[in-house]
């Protein structure tokens, strides 16, 4: 079962998806180039973000754009960025703390209360407060940080700032971010979204503290390769893409940092709360709904329904998806022994009662898998040998054969785990020890020290990008998967997300166009231009005087 078994017509269709996405990306990137040629650098940066946002959600067959990277590097050296700041009320932090500690500036786009990306930052901070001071700048953050993240930052002696609360102008944000780096940081860690252009504009000149790109979105297109002195890749399959397809000069593995989990509550108590019989074998899976979408011969729902139907003592708990559609149908087929619970924050009760963890496919969920594996649960998943970046999760788990290569192997191994208690306990213990060795201190710290040792003393822009990889099954798989899970993600959606960042006059033009094509309220909210409206009137008035 793999993409190689698809018919040639299916493969041709996936290649057409790549070409379709690439054409639309190129049109958006050209608009950024046109804006640069017209001298409107603010508009150029926004259109670069729009193009990157579209490519992030509708894979175009490549992971980096030399055209956009070069454009953003030219903006980085323009007077609009290199000039002095004209924000007299801005207080650039100056470090006055423990000078024996290295200062790390974490640049994020946004922080989230759920999801592994933000937790990675928090755990990295908490693991290293003995030798690092950590601060955060958010390029699009407007709401407060999750309390556990803000607490980690301040406990280390650091601070946090949100650029949207200072200015709506992306060029000014880039200048401010550059000043934060020069005035405070010893090292910069990038955790930004794939479409965030600010790091490239801010750090697109030689000199200053080195820049580390934490590659948390290693399977999709992204900006920033030209300003990364070192890539910190979370897994080997992502590292392979960074080296061949992103032009990474140096890539080092940095496993996702974890913390020692609390002791498990006796499973009898957890099962009692969930009204589950103590003799049942509990299967658990946790992931976003889209990761279970059937594609390319990989059908999680059909596969696990067959397992639960075969083994009457098995109950599957599904956390993430809603109880609807195929999930609801599957539950009915096995008389309710598949329980679909939606999104939940109280994950511990499910960890405590589970016997076996089923990783999602065709799109695996690394953070969830590591969290449960660290608790001693045996993990099983289905590997995609043709498009490994979506299922080959972690350098610590491969040799333990947690992820098998065929549906038949999956059914056999999972069946044995359900029927053989000692076997699953042995597998769980093996899984836990492997994860502990790389994801907890002191083992994890060995990787971090290797990453830090690879950083140069001074930042140097990576130009030109050296790309050697070609389009492969990873690309076609993602293109087809996007077509199912991101079918509604159009050019208009990407424009609508970023239009408020454009200069006022251009926003007005888009609004008029949008009223005919898309919902104008999404394209240009009123609050997006009220702040610039008075300045626009003044400029128009002065321009009219000049014509008289």
Regions found by a protein language model. Give the residues of each.
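N-terminal subdomain of nucleotide-sugar transferases
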Residues: 2-159, 309, 526-548
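C-terminal amphipathic helix plus adjacent low-complexity
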Residues: 7-13, 18, 26-42, 421-548
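Conserved catalytic-core segment of nucleotide-activated headgroup transferases in glycan assembly
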Residues: 118-127, 242-336
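Nucleotide-activated donor-binding/catalytic signature segment of Leloir-type glycosyltransferases, i.e.
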Residues: 156-161, 325-344
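Acidic donor-binding loop of glycosyltransferase active sites
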Residues: 183-187, 352-365, 377
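Catalytic binding pocket for nucleotide-activated donors in carbohydrate/polymer assembly enzymes
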Residues: 360-436
């Amino acid at each position: 079962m793999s993409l190689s078994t698809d018919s040639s017509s299916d493969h041709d269709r996936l290649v057409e998806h790549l070409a379709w996405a690439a054409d639309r990306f190129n049109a958006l990137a050209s608009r950024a180039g046109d804006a640069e040629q017209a001298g409107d650098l603010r508009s150029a940066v926004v259109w670069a973000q729009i193009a990157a946002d579209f490519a992030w959600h509708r894979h175009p067959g490549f992971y980096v754009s030399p055209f956009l990277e070069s454009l953003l590097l030219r903006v980085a050296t323009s007077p609009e960025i290199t000039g002095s700041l004209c924000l007299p009320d801005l207080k650039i932090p100056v470090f006055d703390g423990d000078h024996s500690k290295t200062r790390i500036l974490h640049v994020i786009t946004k922080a989230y209360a759920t999801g592994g990306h933000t937790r990675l930052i928090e755990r990295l901070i908490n693991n290293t407060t003995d030798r690092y001071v950590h601060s955060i700048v958010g390029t699009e953050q407007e709401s407060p940080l999750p309390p556990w993240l803000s607490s980690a930052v301040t406990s280390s002696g650091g601070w946090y700032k949100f650029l949207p609360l200072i200015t709506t102008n992306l060029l000014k944000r880039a200048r401010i971010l550059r000043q934060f780096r020069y005035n405070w940081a010893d090292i910069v860690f990038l955790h930004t979204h794939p479409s965030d252009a600010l790091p490239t504009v801010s750090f697109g000149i030689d000199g200053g503290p080195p820049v580390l790109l934490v590659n948390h979105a290693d399977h999709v297109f992204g900006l920033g390769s030209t300003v990364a002195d070192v890539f910190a890749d979370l897994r080997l399959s992502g590292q392979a893409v960074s080296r061949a397809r992103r032009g990474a000069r140096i890539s080092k593995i940095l496993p996702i940092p974890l913390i020692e989990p609390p002791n498990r509550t006796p499973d009898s108590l957890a099962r009692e709360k969930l009204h589950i019989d103590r003799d049942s074998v509990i299967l658990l899976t946790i992931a976003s709904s889209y990761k279970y979408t059937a594609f390319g011969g990989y059908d999680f729902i059909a596969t696990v329904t067959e397992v639960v139907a075969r083994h009457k003592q098995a109950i599957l708990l599904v956390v993430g998806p809603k109880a609807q559609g195929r999930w609801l149908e599957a539950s009915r087929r096995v008389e309710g022994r598949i329980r679909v619970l939606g999104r939940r924050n109280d994950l511990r009760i499910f960890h405590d009662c589970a016997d076996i963890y089923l990783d999602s496919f065709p799109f695996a969920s690394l953070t969830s898998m590591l969290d449960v594996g660290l608790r001693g649960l045996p993990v099983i998943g289905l590997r995609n040998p043709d498009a490994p970046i979506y299922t080959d999760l972690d350098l610590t788990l491969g040799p333990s054969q947690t992820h098998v290569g065929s549906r038949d192997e999956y059914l056999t191994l999972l069946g044995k785990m359900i029927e053989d208690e000692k076997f699953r306990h042995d597998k769980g213990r093996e899984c836990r020890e492997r994860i502990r060795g790389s994801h907890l201190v002191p083992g994890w710290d060995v990787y971090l020290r290797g990453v830090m040792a690879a950083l140069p003393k001074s930042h140097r822009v990576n130009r030109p990008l050296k790309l050697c990889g070609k389009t492969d099954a990873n690309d076609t798989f993602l293109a087809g998967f996007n077509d199912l899970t991101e079918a509604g993600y159009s050019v208009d959606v990407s424009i609508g997300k970023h239009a408020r960042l454009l200069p006022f006059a251009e926003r007005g033009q888009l609004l008029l166009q949008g009223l005919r094509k898309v919902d104008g309220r999404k394209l240009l909210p009123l609050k997006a231009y009220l702040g610039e409206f008075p300045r626009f009137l003044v400029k128009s008035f002065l321009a009219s005087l000049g014509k008289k």
